[in-house]
A protein has these predicted regions:
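Conserved Rossmann-fold NAD(P)-dependent oxidoreductase catalytic core, especially the SDR/UDP-sugar
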Residues: 4, 90-135
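C-terminal substrate-binding subdomain of Rossmann-fold SDR/epimerase-dehydratase oxidoreductases
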Residues: 11-16, 20-28, 192-314
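Adenosine-cofactor binding site in Rossmann-like domains, unifying the SAM/SAH pocket
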Residues: 26-51
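NAD(P)H-binding glycine-rich loop region in Rossmannoid oxidoreductase-like domains
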Residues: 46-86, 98
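Conserved catalytic-site region of short-chain dehydrogenase/reductase
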Residues: 70-71, 106-121, 137-143, 155, ...
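Short-chain dehydrogenase/reductase
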Residues: 82, 86, 134-146, 176-184, ...
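Flexible, glycine-rich beta-alpha linker
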Residues: 112-114, 137, 161-185, 209-210
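Active-site Tyr-X1-5-Lys
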Residues: 133-166, 185-196
Length: 314
């Protein structure tokens, strides 16, 4: 268990996941949280990361920093996604180990699992078959971080754990028109279509892929829970165990936003993985479950979007 006064470093505190973890830690009474902006500490510069850890000596680390993006971004910047994420992860994890960090939690992504993995996907299906090509570079980087944590545990007896969230959404998301994930992209497009009186919007694919979505504050709650209650080499899936089609999601976002125009589909564009549902029985058996249903989470996300218009420019 983390002491309330323990020094806790949250890497990536300005992102959606990192900021949610900071909120959750504060909500639970942890009062010695340290953070650094990218300007203050470039996590891709090994010397700077080593210096930071040597000086600050954080007892616990939540590694939520990452370069993320949707299908378009992942296809256009394969090398960038792989280099940035692998470099960042190795620098932070290695420096944490070198400086006696008591426990580290690595945040991954469900895209690490094979494209055609049996559904729902168990933690044990990792590396059993081919990855989804549209985000292969990012997935390989995340697998490397996960495995490095496991290997440190096995070789040096560290207590480094990993969490693999399903598709996330919520406050402080990235609403960039081409470099965002599906929920923020749909929120922005539906909102702009409503405001501008656009009669129809066109979405990629045919709307058939099945997806699962977890509100980011629920993930943050699980992250703190696992830091206090879980140790092990195998990752832990984070999700709701519920799924819906992209078409159903698009219609639900339109409902929440208040867009009443027509939704069309461009089947010449890629769908991505046909189905992605996590088996969350491991987290459930540990005593955790999500709280926020999708429609309520989308409503909260849209409120956040409206209250923070500059996020659409990121």
């Amino acid at each position: 268990m983390m002491d309330k006064n323990a020094k806790i470093y949250v890497a990536g505190h300005r992102g959606m996941v990192g900021s949610a973890i900071v909120r959750e830690l504060q909500r639970q009474g942890y009062n010695n949280i340290i953070t650094r902006t990218h300007k203050e500490l470039d996590l891709c510069r090994q010397e700077n990361v080593e210096k930071f850890f040597a000086e600050e000596k954080p007892e616990y680390v939540f590694l939520a920093a990452a370069k993320v993006g949707g299908i378009v971004a992942n296809q256009e910047a394969l090398a960038d996604f792989m280099w940035f994420n692998m470099t960042l992860e190795m620098n932070v994890i290695h420096s944490a180990w070198q400086n006696g960090c008591k426990k580290l939690e690595f945040l991954g992504s469900s895209c690490i699992y094979p494209r055609m993995a049996p559904q729902p996907m168990k933690e044990s299906c990792l590396l059993t078959s081919e990855l989804e090509k549209t985000n292969e570079a990012y997935a390989l980087a995340k697998i490397s971080g996960l495995k490095y944590c496991e290997f440190l545990n096995r070789q040096y007896g560290t207590d480094y754990i990993s969490v693999m969230p399903t598709n996330l959404y919520g406050p402080n998301d990235n609403y960039h028109p081409t470099h965002s994930h599906v929920v923020p992209a749909l929120i922005r497009r539906s909102h702009e279509a409503k405001v501008n009186g656009v009669e129809s919007v066109t979405c990629w694919g045919d709307g058939s892929p099945l997806r699962e979505f977890l509100y980011v504050d629920d993930l943050a709650n699980l992250c703190v829970f696992l830091m206090n209650h879980y140790s092990g080499n195998e990752t832990v899936n984070a999700g709701t165990g519920k799924e819906l089609t992209i078409k159903e999601l698009t219609e639900l976002v339109a409902k929440v936003v208040g867009y009443t125009g027509k939704i069309e589909w461009d089947a010449s564009k890629p769908n991505g993985t046909p189905r992605k549902l996590l088996d969350v029985s491991k987290a459930t058996n540990l005593g955790w479950t999500y709280k926020t249903e999708l429609e309520e989470g989308l409503r909260l996300s849209y409120e956040d979007f409206l209250n923070n218009p500059m996020r659409a420019e990121r």
